[in-house]
Design a protein with these regions (language model features):
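Active-site metal-binding loops of divalent metal-dependent hydrolases
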Residues: 23, 144, 174, 265
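Active-site beta-loop-alpha junctions enriched in small/polar residues
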Residues: 116, 144, 175-179, 205-206, ...
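Conserved phosphate/ATP/ADP-binding segment of small-molecule kinases
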Residues: 166, 179-246
């Protein structure tokens, strides 16, 4: 494995929420227009798990994000930006032998990724060796990480093994990305991980692609033992199965500018409410409220703490 520089960990309270996963530099049109004709682009960090940590931090939950970045200007910018959101980045490291990944948002048309052999794709179990996962209340990661590389899949397995049996709960967002792996390979791997998690987030559309599920009940049938199973159905709403009960909360009517990142915002809103001890309906509503803010923006995140954080290119 290439040498990876360790971050200097400073002493401090263990965050209630620890997230683990890749973050790239995202370039997005400043306005809701196609990438092909946009004249101004903005730079923002973009990554499922750092998004969750940033949203949760803005909601008052002490949160940390763990990852590996390149030893480059983009990596330094990402770390600084996420830290300014109030996220604990003491366990973020830099790999001098690999670059930070980049991706472009094309509003309404998808995303273009440039992440091959990125620093984060070289993460492995050693990435979390010094992270006190067992002392957090919730550890959150997603299925994206498993698809990045074999060492990243080993990282996910190590996290699951360490959190199992500890006082922490394991939160897992299925986050299936067809651009990273085919459904034939992803379906059994993601189902196995979801069955071992305490809290699972999955979109009904991705459950259909992966496991031929048509209804929330179909998803519950293949994940019957999950402590809290949250199934998101776009502009319809979200269903939670927990403690032998089923609850549904309708989505908030919203004019969607860009959907990418809304799932991360939902997870953060839900987890923050769960850490506050809120009941099911409040948890689901908190997820919808946070997701709505992202749906109204071209960014994965909202409420930038420093106006100058966005640079035009």
């Amino acid at each position: 494995m290439p040498h990876t520089a360790r971050a200097t960990a400073t002493a401090g309270p263990i965050p209630r929420l620890i997230t683990i996963g890749e973050t790239m530099m995202m370039l997005t049109p400043e306005h809701a227009e196609p990438l092909a004709t946009a004249s101004k682009l903005s730079l923002h960090p973009g990554g499922a798990e750092s998004n969750v940590a940033s949203h949760a931090a803005h909601l008052g939950i002490p949160s940390a994000w763990v990852s590996v970045l390149g030893e480059d200007v983009l990596g330094r910018r990402i770390r600084t930006s996420i830290e300014r959101h109030g996220v604990d980045v003491r366990w973020v490291t830099n790999n001098p032998d690999a670059s930070t990944g980049v991706y472009f948002k094309d509003p309404g048309r998808g995303v273009l990724y440039y992440r091959r052999d990125s620093a984060a794709s070289r993460m492995g179990p050693s990435t979390v060796a010094s992270v006190p996962l067992e002392q957090a209340e919730i550890v959150h990661l997603s299925g994206i990480t498993s698809a990045l590389s074999s060492s990243c899949a080993d990282l996910v397995e190590a996290v699951f093994e360490r959190v199992a049996g500890s006082g922490a709960s394991l939160s897992f967002d299925v986050n299936y990305r067809p651009s990273l792996w085919r459904a034939g390979a992803a379906a059994p791997a993601l189902l196995s991980l979801a069955n071992r998690a305490d809290i699972v987030f999955v979109g009904l559309d991705e459950a259909q692609s992966l496991w031929d599920c048509v209804t929330p009940e179909d998803v519950h049938a293949i994940l019957p033992d999950t402590g809290r199973l949250i199934i998101k159905d776009g502009d319809v709403g979200a269903t939670e199965f927990s403690a032998g009960t089923r609850a549904f909360e309708p989505a908030i009517p919203t004019e969607v500018i860009e959907a990418v990142g809304a799932g991360d915002a939902f997870a953060a809103g839900y987890l923050s409410a769960a850490l506050r001890g809120d009941p099911t309906a409040v948890r689901l509503r908190a997820g919808h409220e946070r997701a709505r803010l992202v749906l109204l923006s071209t960014s994965d995140f909202i409420a930038e703490p420093v106006p100058t954080q966005t640079s035009k290119i």
